[in-house]
């Protein structure tokens, strides 16, 4: 192992000089051990990642933690490989930082645990799975109108308090319970409070045992926030490649991954490109996204929360992400105001999988008819607001009546929200979802009150609820 010396510290950027031409490779992890002021840890260890070889035996590195206490002249050791993180079933139920160290104050991991490098090649062309298989979530609005593909990439758009976290928890719960699947959650630039809340909520709902969590919090240096997504992905890849599992990878927030990359790029002195972003934006995004895919032995399906700066979808950060997405799930605040949960906008959400070749003719026809009906209802809302329902034609009155039932039937009780709602959660298979909406569109349930359709699972639950309301079914 070659050794060097710190010659310059500029915030999270550290320059290191090595003697005798023993320069570490790009992405190699370097370690500095130094005395700390903290009583509980008299020596601190700082990990650096090599970013640029400057010449004259000097490398420029990015720190993965605070550089407080680092001085010129300190000894630096080249580990000889990129950052490695723990992988395997031992990671389930645990919380890690970017370096794969546990931060949940639980039992330490065994010393002989397997570790993988966070920088890896994407699967080769011949390893990719050629089938397009739907990932059943048990959530009606998703399965019917914007179905997810196994090994696909889904963008989850939504503001604060519209139900992103609850939707994420339910997806983790359903895949863990119904499919026995593994989930990995990567908090990228995450608020510490949000990550803390999510951990305890998942612990209470019992899904933590099937989940590995990785956090690079908002207060950490940009190097940690940029690499933490790769740490989560590396853990997920192991379950796909070695355990042959279908894995769900959540990244919140992919915009903060881009933002951290932009900060690092500026610190390294690169010339910025459009809107001040890094010139390597598309490359960095591609390196991450291309590793999230289905192979012949398993799949990594990614659900990514995406912040859109100033609601500008042409901003380079979301625009670059769009190129990689197979489906988008848009959460709408207006629906939460109506008490419709999950508040997924059925008209704005899209999916590449919604085609007759993938979901089948019947599913496709029912989904497009639902969208057509809801679009017509949206067009009529202005007229209703000004003139009232009486001014509509009989056909439009029927459309509005059915559209409202459809809208309410797209809502659903969640297992992870049982403690708040007092109502049992429901998992609805795709076949039952399609049949329920097909009968609803055909007018079979026009006599059932609208409220019977709100926050239920199967169509049988609607009929049961209607009976309780004293309606003949």
Swiss-Prot record:
Enzyme Commission number(s) of this protein: 7.1.2.2
Record keywords, A-Z: ATP synthesis, ATP-binding, Cell membrane, CF(1), Hydrogen ion transport, Ion transport, Membrane, Nucleotide-binding, Translocase, Transport
Subcellular location: Cell membrane
Residues that, per the record, bind ATP: 158-165
First-listed, main subcellular location of the protein, grouped into a coarse class: membrane
Keyword Translocase part of the UniProt annotation: yes
Catalyzed chemical reaction(s): ATP + H2O + 4 H(+)(in) = ADP + phosphate + 5 H(+)(out)
Classification via PANTHER family: ATP SYNTHASE, ATP SYNTHASE SUBUNIT BETA, MITOCHONDRIAL
Functional note: Produces ATP from ADP in the presence of a proton gradient across the membrane. The catalytic sites are hosted primarily by the beta subunits.
UniProt family annotation: Belongs to the ATPase alpha/beta chains family.
Assembly mode: F-type ATPases have 2 components, CF(1) - the catalytic core - and CF(0) - the membrane proton channel. CF(1) has five subunits: alpha(3), beta(3), gamma(1), delta(1), epsilon(1). CF(0) has three main subunits: a(1), b(2) and c(9-12). The alpha and beta chains form an alternating ring which encloses part of the gamma chain. CF(1) is attached to CF(0) by a central stalk formed by the gamma and epsilon chains, while a peripheral stalk is formed by the delta and b chains.
Protein name per its UniProtKB record: ATP synthase subunit beta 2
Source organism per UniProt: Listeria innocua serovar 6a (strain ATCC BAA-680 / CLIP 11262)
Gene for this chain: atpD2
